[in-house]
Design a protein with these regions (language model features):
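Catalytic centers of hydrolytic enzymes
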Residues: 22, 97-338
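Acidic, metal/ion-coordinating pockets
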Residues: 1-131, 135-137, 167-179, 243, ...
C-alpha cells in the first residue's frame, strides 16, 4: 500500500512569532494548496493520504471539512490528547497530546485506494517501565555533558504544584509574572499563554534546566515599558479573539495571555472588542483608567529591538531570592459563558 505523508506547518508563524526573524518565508492557511497536493499524490498512486499537521485541533477539524481526499490528520500544536479520533466525513483527526505523554497507534484498512476501516489506540507512556535504548542514551549524555553542571544546578524549591496548562492561568506562569513584577519593578506583568513545559510537584528542587524548560525562546528579552489602560484592553481583546473566535481559521491556538497584578472579566460568548471588562489593578483594587499609563513588564515580544534581560535570568534571580517558592490560587480572572 502506498501511503503519502503531507506536512502542514503552523500557519500563523508570522503572527505568533517575530516575522522579522524569517523574512524570506511565507505561511498561512491555504486550502487550495493542500487540495492540489492531495490530488498530486493521489495521481502519483497514493492509496492513503496522511497529513502531519501543526495547525491545531480545531483548525484541522475545519480543514478536514474543506479539503477532500485526506484519510488521516495527525494533529499537533494545541496539545490535545483524545482517546478516540474525531471523524469529519471520511477523515479521522487524531490528537496525541504532548511532551511524550502518549503515542497513538493507528491501524488502517485500505482497499482500492479507500480507507474502509480503522482502529486507534492512545497509549500512555510510563518512562519508568520502558528500558532506554543504550546507544541513544549514550549519545544524549555525550551531547549534554558540557552543560550538565550548569543545567543541574539547584536554584530553589517549590512548595506548590507548578503547571503550565489552564485556559487563563497556570502556576508556572503565575511564578513568571511574580518574577517580572518584582525583578522589573512593574505594576503589571504579561506572559504569553504558551502550552509547553512540564509540571513540577510540591517539594521538588527547581534546577536551572527546569527554568529553561518553561522560558526558552529565541526572543526572551524581558521588557519594561509604559502602556495605557486602553492599550492593555486592546491586547487582551486581541489575544482573546485568537482563542475564542467562532471560526477556527481565526484561532491561533495557545491559551490566554497571563497577567500579573491585573484582574479582569471575560465573556467568551461576546464578539471581539466586547469580551473584556472590569480591568482592575490588583494592588489597589482600582479599575484601570484607559487614559492612564501603567508600568508593564513582559517577555516574548514579537517586536524587533526589544531590550531587557533574558526571562530565564529574571525568573532565576527571583527564585534565588525566595529560596522556596509558594504560588497560591489565582482568582484574578472571572470567566463568563464558558
Amino acid at each position: 500500500t502506498k501511503i503519502a505523508v503531507i506536512g502542514q506547518a503552523f500557519p500563523y508563524i508570522p503572527i505568533a512569532n517575530p516575522s522579522w526573524m524569517f523574512p524570506e518565508y511565507s505561511f498561512g492557511i491555504r486550502d487550495e494548496n493542500m487540495s492540489a497536493m492531495v490530488a498530486e499524490v493521489r495521481a502519483a498512486g497514493a492509496e492513503c493520504v496522511v497529513v502531519l499537521s501543526h495547525n491545531g485541533f480545531d483548525v484541522d477539524k475545519k480543514m478536514a471539512s474543506v479539503v477532500p481526499g485526506i484519510d488521516v490528520i495527525l494533529s499537533g500544536h494545541t496539545h490535545d490528547a483524545l482517546p478516540e479520533p474525531y471523524v469529519v466525513g471520511e477523515t479521522i483527526v487524531i490528537a496525541s497530546g504532548s511532551n511524550g505523554k502518549f503515542v497513538s497507534r493507528v491501524d488502517l484498512d485500505i482497499r482500492d485506494a479507500r480507507m474502509i476501516g480503522y482502529r486507534t489506540k492512545l497509549i500512555p507512556i510510563f518512562s519508568d517501565v520502558i528500558e532506554p535504548d543504550k546507544e541513544v542514551s549514550a549519545l544524549i549524555d555525550q551531547q549534554r555533558a558540557p552543560y550538565q553542571a550548569e543545567l543541574s544546578e539547584v536554584i530553589g524549591q517549590t512548595d506548590s504544584l507548578l503547571y503550565r496548562r489552564g485556559n487563563f492561568n497556570g502556576t508556572w506562569d503565575d511564578l513568571i509574572c511574580d518574577a517580572l513584577l518584582s525583578e522589573r519593578d512593574a505594576e503589571i506583568a504579561l506572559s504569553p499563554g504558551v502550552r509547553w513545559g512540564p509540571s513540577m510537584l510540591p517539594g521538588q528542587d527547581i534546577t536551572r534546566e527546569d527554568i529553561y524548560n518553561v522560558t526558552s525562546m529565541t526572543y526572551g528579552e524581558a521588557y519594561r515599558s509604559e502602556m495605557t489602560g486602553h492599550m492593555l484592553n486592546v491586547i487582551l481583546e486581541d489575544v482573546a479573539d485568537n482563542i475564542f473566535n467562532p471560526d477556527p481559521y481565526y484561532q491561533q491556538g495557545g491559551d490566554m495571555v497571563r497577567t500579573g497584578g491585573l484582574g479582569y472579566t471575560i465573556d467568551v460568548t461576546k464578539p471581539q472588542g466586547e469580551r473584556i471588562s472590569n480591568l482592575t489593578l490588583l494592588k489597589t483594587g482600582e479599575l484601570i483608567d484607559p487614559a492612564k499609563a501603567y508600568v508593564v513588564a513582559g517577555w516574548a515580544s514579537v517586536n524587533e529591538g526589544t531590550d531587557g534581560p533574558q526571562i530565564w535570568d529574571v525568573v532565576e534571580n527571583h527564585i534565588k531570592k525566595q529560596g522556596t517558592v509558594s504560588v497560591s490560587g489565582n482568582n484574578s480572572v472571572e470567566v463568563i459563558g464558558a
